[in-house]
Amino acid sequence: MSARKRIVVGVAGGIAAYKACTVVRQLTEAGHSVRVVPTESALRFVGAATFEALSGNPVHTGVFTDVHEVQHVRIGQQADLVVIAPATADLLARAVAGRADDLLTATLLTARCPVLFAPAMHTEMWLHPATVDNVATLRRRGAVVLEPASGRLTGADSGPGRLPEAEEITTLAQLLLERADALPYDMAGVKALVTAGGTREPLDPVRFIGNRSSGKQGYAVARVLAQRGADVTLIAGNTAGLIDPAGVEMVHIGSATQLRDAVSKHAPDANVLVMAAAVADFRPAHVAAAKIKKGASEPSSIDLVRNDDVLAGAVRARADGQLPNMRAIVGFAAETGDANGDVLFHARAKLERKGCDLLVVNAVGENRAFEVDHNDGWLLSADGTESALEHGSKTLMATRIVDSIAAFLKSQDG
């Protein structure tokens, strides 16, 4: 975790303002000093006393409050990060125009730190050309603007415009503090296909052969790609409990065969393929139609057949000209050492065998790789370059992976 930082949470006046309470609480519990700056409209949804209780700091709303302390300048100057959640269409427009007609917009003008906007508004507002232009302008100036989530909105409306989940906002806030700068918007125009989670190969209607992959690392990669401008499709295997990344097209699958078919369908349009899913190498040759019962008829062995190698298949398809748009293929390897060699020995062999451009390597062990929120490993390149991925959150590791993908694409452009 980053050292204690000073974070300003700006709250604009939308129905999602109540969700800012969770953002404030999570950032405060992470050890940061949080100052809440709501607009007057926001206080119609959540009272100042609530924000003061959650943050432990006084709440100021007006430019003319405590004038002798020059709050309209001081709050922004002292901030290490500004988070606007929710950011309404009106707030985005005023930020682009450089307005300073309340304490929040004045704070934005004086801040010299990363700024993160988490939009929330009706679908029509989000898709309006004015808002689209405003978001593009803010991103061009260096701000990070999340894509809103899709789902139920105010009243009976449904569609893109929901405030991203608090966990997504606070995770990205933490990442920005760790990086101490804004995320680049360097994947704009890139179509990325990401796989995540683990496949399950059924034995009968109840049982299956599976693995321990939670999907957290693949979800983090998809989320960072989207935040940096990519058009992302995420193929997720058995990832119940994970929050779908905002602004990402989701495809849910169960088995390795289903994952293969989904990749085959979406890969022709993709420029980047990130195979973070843990795909079963084998599946039962026969699937029982009914639950296998204990007793005389229970099997003494299970015959297995090999699943198609999805990663190697994508590499072959590109070489055969079937994926003309594909510029980068990234594989993942969860390895253990054995009598024949250590983790990197097996990873290098896999990179050569698969033929992908980059390979992310994780050493499997207790509290490592699977079912945890932090990770480490190595990144191997087909040109022989190897770099360590230092221990950190899976979001931070995803950022380093996307950094490497961006650098690889740039190297292709000459």
Curated annotation (Swiss-Prot):
Two related chemical scaffolds that potently inhibit the activity of the CoaB moiety of CoaBC through a cryptic allosteric site that sits in the dimer interface region of the CoaB enzyme were identified. Residues 1-191 are annotated as: Phosphopantothenoylcysteine decarboxylase. Its EC number is 4.1.1.36, 6.3.2.5. One of its GO terms (molecular function) is FMN binding. It comes from the Bacteria. Homododecamer. NCBIfam families: coaBC_dfp (TIGR00521). This is Coenzyme A biosynthesis bifunctional protein CoaBC. The lineage of its organism: Bacteria, Bacillati, Actinomycetota, Actinomycetes, Mycobacteriales.
